[in-house]
Each structure stands twice: as structure tokens, then as C-alpha cells.
Amino acid sequence: MAYFNDIAPIKYEGTKTKNMFAFRHYNPEEVVAGKTMEEQLHFALAFWHTITMDGADPFGSATMERPWDLEGGSELDRAHRRVDAFFEIAEKLGVKYYCFHDIDIAPTGNSLKEFYANLDEITDHLLEKQKETGIKLLWNTANMFSNPRYMNGVSTSNRAEVFAYGAAQVKKGLELSKKLGGENYVFWGGREGYESLLNTDMGLEMDHMAKFFHLAIDYAKSINHLPIFLIELKPKEPMTHQYDFDAATALAFLQKYDLDKYFKLNIETNHAWLAGHTFEHELNTARTFGALGSIDANQGNYLLGWDTDEFPTLVIDITLQGWILMHVRLKVQQPSLKTNSCLISLKNVIVHTRRQKLVNLSKMEQQLLKVLLLMLLSMGMTSNLILTT
């Protein structure tokens, strides 16, 4: 079923266009530094904010009703509809890559065996869509932070059965990565850290975390599929302190445990700010050590101490880092747009920057953006960019 019949594919129309559903500055066919923009910038659409987000937050329930979630049937039926809607959005935007957590795409069922079966069925559908559209899997990951079993971590948990369950999720995730041709595999240790040092053996926990990563590497080698492993950095939230605090901390960990030749870093703007750094600092640290793997582009709120995934609002902040599109959440206060709430996914990506008056760049500013992109390319500072809506 199609959900966006009334929206044509988004094309580049230049800065003077009045069409809100058009790119004004991103021209995928324009050559910059010997390659097209599309070749230089591997934009990826993320499954979670784009398709599964319902507007719930820690203080309230869902505010959004997605058309693909309202048509009845089983949880698997809904999962298949989500795949169709997702690839339709990606095609409309011209995005060539995508990313997902395992629980984003398939229901977990009542057992690990049932979860595996659901993942197999849905990834068959994903593979069909990949072949049909040419869209590729940039990275996938296992959600090892939402279920209550992971409240004290996975690899750093004091319960062996929790460690084992998480390892089983990663095992399946690597098999799915091979099946779908994934280029990277991500670890975000949202609960790999501590609430208090009074009951924490930090050295032991980091030993266990390193062992977990080595097991993942060994298994990837055993199935002849060794993607680039990425650690997504975040200093806190939900834990008081997380072991992937920032680029320097993660690099020290990787070097200590002989993991640095297998891992690179996934840098997110908002997470850098939470660590007390600028995004530029984290990018430069990763680049200096040859560990810049992927970018989640967004911004936070300097006055808040938690992750907000907001749209960038200043031209200089966008151009300095080479941001083009951004890792952002739908607003809880945006339950609908016209009659289809699903249109928000497209409209936020294309129109929100217009509301913030970022697209009305002068010719000089346009040239500055291109010069900065060339500088970033020469410094090796452009890599995979994650676009989540």
C-alpha cells in the first residue's frame, strides 16, 4: 500500500523555487571535489524516529497516530506495513541508505526463538525492498536498553543470563547484517555505566564489556562478515556515567583492549554537547585517531541537560560541521499534519529549515557552504551521515 501518493519525489530546484517539497541547496548530481554530492554524502534514513515514534515521552503517552499502524491485523502485519511506508519515504527523498534497531523492525514475541523468526520474516521483506529500490543498509544494531532485563547494562550487568541474552541479540544482528549487506554495525551502551561508584567495580565491568566486543568480532569473522563496528558515544542518560562518555574516553578503552583496529566512532552532536564538548571537538578527536566512522547530525539545547535531538537553527553551526540534514525527533506537539500524520516525516525534513530561515542563503553563503564542504573533504572529515526524521 502507498501512503504518499500525493507527494512527488523530492528534487533539486535551486534557491529560487517556491516549492516547499524541493531541495534548494542539496543537488545530488552536482560535482564537488571530483565526486557528486550523492557520492560524497551517504545520507541514511533511520527507522525509529521516521516510522515507529509515537510522540510518547517520560511525562506523557503517545500523541501521534501513524496510518500504517491503524489498519489492524497482527503485529507482524503492522511490521510489514511499516517497511513499505519506510521505503516509500526513502525513495521520495532520494536517500540511498538506512539504519535500524532490531526491535524497530519486528515484534519481539514471547521468546528469543519467536523474535528470531519475526526478524527473519521482516528482513526477507527488507531485502526485497533493497533489491527493488537499490537502497542499502548503512548499519543496524540491537536495542539493549529498552527491556527491563537490561536496567543494569548488558555486558556490564552482574547477571550472566543478561549478558548471554544480549550476546544472542548481537549474534542475530550480525547475521542480519550479512543477509542485508550491512556496511557497519553499531553498539550504543546506553546502560553500560553506573549509577553510583559505591557499588561499582569499574575495571571489572569494562573487562566484561571488552570481552563482549571481542565475542562479537569473533562471531563476525566466523560467518565471513566483518562490518566496521561503530561505538555511539554518549556521556550520560539513562545512566549517571556511561563508559562511552566521549571520543577520547572511547578511544582509550578501544586501545587498552586491542579493539581499535575493528572499531570506529559514531559521533552525535547532541551527545557531544552533553559531554561538555563542541561537535567540532569530537569530530577532530575522532579524525586525529583515524576513527571517524559515522555522524548523527542534529543539535541539543544548551540550557537543558538531556538529549533533545533538535533541528539546527544557525547557518554557521551547520556549515562548520558540514551538516546538510539532521538527526531529529518529531515534536510531541505535532500529532497531525492535514489529515495524514505520516506527512510530518517528509515535511519536517524538507521544510523545517525554511521555517528557521536557513534556506535563504545569499550566493556568497552558498559558496561558503561549498568551500567548507571541500575543506572537510580535504581533512577527511566527511563520512556517513545519519538522517532521522
Curated annotation (Swiss-Prot):
NCBIfam families: PRK05474.1, xylose_isom_A. The active site is at H101, D104. InterPro entries: Xyl_isomerase-like_sf, Xyl_isomerase-like_TIM-brl, Xylose_isom_bac, Xylose_isomerase. Its cofactor is Mg(2+). Its EC number is 5.3.1.5. Binds 2 magnesium ions per subunit. Its main location: cytoplasm. SUPFAM superfamilies: Xylose isomerase-like (SSF51658). One of its GO terms (biological process) is D-xylose metabolic process. This is Xylose isomerase. Mg(2+) 1 binds at E232, E268, D296. GO terms for cellular component: cytoplasm. Homotetramer. It is found in: Cytoplasm.
